[in-house]
């Protein structure tokens, strides 16, 4: 089923709700980067987190970049997501696998804390106007959801609850997504709204299970948690907005990158190989720069 994002409000407009499905985007990233199950889940969580953040931007070309710099064996990650629902990203060590950790009598989970280690979450919000806004917070435990909640608390001072998860069955990711619930800025001093948000969130025992049981129906997922949802707040556009793994790379961007090299470097490439192959870190697309194209770059620098 196509990934998508839904926005709504509850409590008479006092609480903002956003739910996102990133299953297909995660599987596309797995295919392109050769990800393990662990790194597929981590990148899928980062996809969900970045899309949830981007959902509040007022313009469709607004973008959010999440970067994790840490000392764990994952070797960091970078995700770029837009208000338009397009997302892309990569991890430093795509093949990483770790032993599962026991979280209950008969339940096990990926060791996200060990994978990411200690470090920082860097968030860049680019509205397309002026300088991008950058903020950095320490990683809480590497499960992405709590790290994002920490960012929202420290950087935006907004009472928020973040749930991000996935479910794996028969060696495949069958659902991945997230939910963001925020008390809106004009209401963030209302103790009743904050209490309502806390009470609703306490009822979530396993977000991954709730996501799976909703059968990809994000509206049902939201309604199960916030039955007092304001139906009028859900526009047709919000109901149908798609989310997908989409990269902005192109042959022209590759040519522009090559043009940044010194003349001597271009001459060395031409002499040794007669061509160059550029690989996009975000999506692994390959672009061949041929002999004539490199020669033209050299001539233009003469």
From Swiss-Prot:
GO molecular function, one term: unfolded protein binding
Gene3D superfamilies (UniProt xref): Hsp33 domain, HSP33 redox switch-like
Chief location category: cytoplasm
Protein name in the entry: 33 kDa chaperonin
Coiled coil residues, start to end: none
GO cellular component, as recorded: cytoplasm
GO biological process, one term: protein refolding
One Pfam family cited in the UniProt record for this chain: HSP33
Biological source species: Prochlorococcus marinus (strain AS9601)
InterPro entries tied to this protein: Heat_shock_Hsp33, Heat_shock_Hsp33_C, Heat_shock_Hsp33_N
Keyword check for Chaperone: yes
């Amino acid at each position: 089923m196509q990934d998508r994002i839904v926005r709504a409000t509850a409590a008479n407009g006092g609480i903002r709700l956003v739910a996102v499905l990133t299953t297909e985007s995660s599987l596309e990233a797995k295919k392109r980067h050769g990800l393990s199950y662990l790194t597929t889940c981590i990148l899928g969580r980062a996809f969900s987190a970045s899309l949830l953040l981007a959902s509040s931007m007022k313009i469709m070309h607004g973008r959010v970049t999440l970067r994790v710099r840490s000392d764990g064996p994952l070797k960091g990650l970078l995700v770029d997501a837009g208000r338009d629902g397009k997302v892309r990203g990569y991890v430093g060590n795509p093949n990483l696998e770790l032993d599962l950790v026991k979280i209950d009598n008969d339940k096990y989970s990926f060791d996200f804390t060990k994978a990411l280690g200690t470090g920082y979450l860097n968030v860049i919000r680019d509205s397309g106007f002026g300088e991008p806004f950058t903020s950095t917070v320490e990683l809480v435990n590497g499960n992405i959801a709590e790290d994002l909640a920490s960012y929202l608390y420290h950087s935006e001072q907004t009472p928020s609850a973040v749930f991000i998860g996935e479910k794996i069955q028969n060696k495949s990711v069958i659902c991945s997504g997230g939910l963001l619930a925020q008390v809106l800025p004009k209401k963030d001093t209302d103790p009743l709204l904050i209490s309502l948000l806390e009470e609703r969130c306490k009822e979530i025992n396993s977000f991954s299970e709730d996501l799976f049981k909703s059968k990809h129906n994000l509206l049902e997922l939201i309604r199960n948690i916030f039955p007092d949802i304001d139906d009028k707040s859900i526009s047709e556009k919000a109901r149908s907005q798609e989310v997908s793994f989409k990269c902005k790379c192109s042959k022209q961007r590759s040519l522009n990158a090559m043009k940044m090299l010194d003349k001597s470097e271009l001459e060395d490439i031409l002499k040794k190989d007669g061509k160059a192959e550029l690989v996009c870190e975000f999506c692994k697309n390959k672009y061949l720069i041929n002999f004539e194209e490199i020669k033209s770059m050299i001539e233009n620098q003469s």
